[in-house]
Curated annotation (Swiss-Prot):
Transmembrane segments: none
UniProt family annotation: Belongs to the universal ribosomal protein uL1 family.
Species in which this protein is naturally found: Arthrobacter sp. (strain FB24)
Gene Ontology, cellular component aspect: large ribosomal subunit
Record-given protein name: Large ribosomal subunit protein uL1
Amino acid sequence: MAKRSKAYEAAAAKIDAEKFYAPFEAVTLAKDTNPSKFDATVEVAFRLGVDPRKADQMVRGTVNLPHGTGKVARVLVFATGDKAEAAIAAGADFVGSDDLIEKIAAGWTDFDAAVATPDLMGKVGRLGKVLGPRNLMPNPKTGTVTPDVTKAVNDIKGGKIDFRVDKHSNLHFIIGKVSFDAIKLAENYAAALEEVLRLKPSASKGRYIQKATVATTFGPGISVDPNVTKVLTEV
């Protein structure tokens, strides 16, 4: 195991490893224990009581964080004609069709989200081996296969994020930056948790959210009480 820095060890010493913190308390502590000098990302990880190998236990969806993530997403749109012009006007970073498909097929994935008009999905679908593992494949269930490219781009730029449980039954979310007020981080956390709870598969038995952890990019993990769904501001 790699040796932890003195800053990390000092930060970890402020956390009670046996305690489950309320969301507001957890994000406040994450801000206070950030060992980095830069404006680090604040993330949350949920361990779910599902078996992602089974189709009826897959958890996938989107959530609009009320305060965004602090990161402006680079959005790619597969579109032509008027739809391409609309995507450009909405602020998409990359817009095209065959040219982008060829570039991605060669291994380029320097973007954070992809949107496609329905008529191009026959071609875009061939990129599954490249985009699928990176959770970048446009999907009608997440609103990224749509004729309304303007709304899709605006939603993503405004803080909408896609999520999908990984093979280890974990979900990961960026909920903001250390520079965010704690209340905004807590409200983003609550929005993510609410959507995860809403999407609980009926086939999932037993405890659904088994663990919730908040941490900054290089900071120690802070256990959050998954039973607390409201934003409580007392610490």
